[in-house]
Amino acid sequence: MKIVVSVENAAAINEVAEYNPTFIEIRLDRMEGDLQDQVRAIREKTDIPLIATLRSRDEGGRFVGDADLWARIVGPIARYVDIVDVEARYRDHAPFIKSQGVQILASLHTNEMPTVPELGRIDEMLRSYGDIPKIVVRPKTREDLFELVLFTHQAQKPICTSIMGAEFRYARAILPLFGSEFTFSHAGAPTAEGQYHIREMRQLADLLK
C-alpha cells in the first residue's frame, strides 16, 4: 500500500520523514509565506518523493484564484517535486507543468456520488491530460461505496480513488486493496475530513495484508 502523508509546513518534514511514507504531499493552499522557498527547503530535507497540491476551495481546499494564478504559483515550484496535482479546471496548464519533468496527478473531487458510467467518463477525461487519475467522491450509502470499490477494481491502472467525509473513512484503507494507487493520511493535522494518521494507516495496512 502506497501511503501519502499530507503536510502544510516545512517544519513538519523531519517528523513526517520518520514514518517513511511513500510520498509526501505538500498542501500549498494551506501554507503561508514564500511557497517556493518552503518547497525548496522541504526538497533539501528529504529524498522522499514529493507531490505538490494547490487545492481549490471548490474541491475541498483553500485556493480561490483562477487558472492563470494557479499556474503562476505552481509553475516555479514544479521543479522541486516529483508529481503535481492538477485539477480538471486547471488542465489547460498541464502541458506546461509536465514540461518541468514531473508526472501529473489529474484530480477531481466532488461531494456527489457519480454513477459507474459517470466515473468512467471522469476517468477518461482525467487521463486525457494526466498520468494518474485521482477521483474522490462522497458515497451516500454502502451501495455507493460498493460501486466505487468495483469501479476501482475494474478501472485501467494506475488510478487513485478515495472518499470525502468521515462516514465511510474506512474506505481509505480498503480502496488500495482493490487497485487504488495511493491512500492519503496525515502526521498531525488532517488536511481532509476523515483522514487517518499515518500510524493508524500503517496498522490497518499491516492487518489487511
Curated annotation (Swiss-Prot):
It holds the Pfam family DHquinase_I. Keywords: Amino-acid biosynthesis, Aromatic amino acid biosynthesis, Lyase, Schiff base. InterPro entries: Aldolase_TIM, DHquinase_I, Type-I_3-dehydroquinase. This is 3-dehydroquinate dehydratase. It is an enzyme of class 4 (lyase). Its EC number is 4.2.1.10. The gene is aroD. GO terms for biological process: 3,4-dihydroxybenzoate biosynthetic process; amino acid biosynthetic process; aromatic amino acid family biosynthetic process; chorismate biosynthetic process. It catalyses: 3-dehydroquinate = 3-dehydroshikimate + H2O. Pathway: Metabolic intermediate biosynthesis; chorismate biosynthesis; chorismate from D-erythrose 4-phosphate and phosphoenolpyruvate: step 3/7.
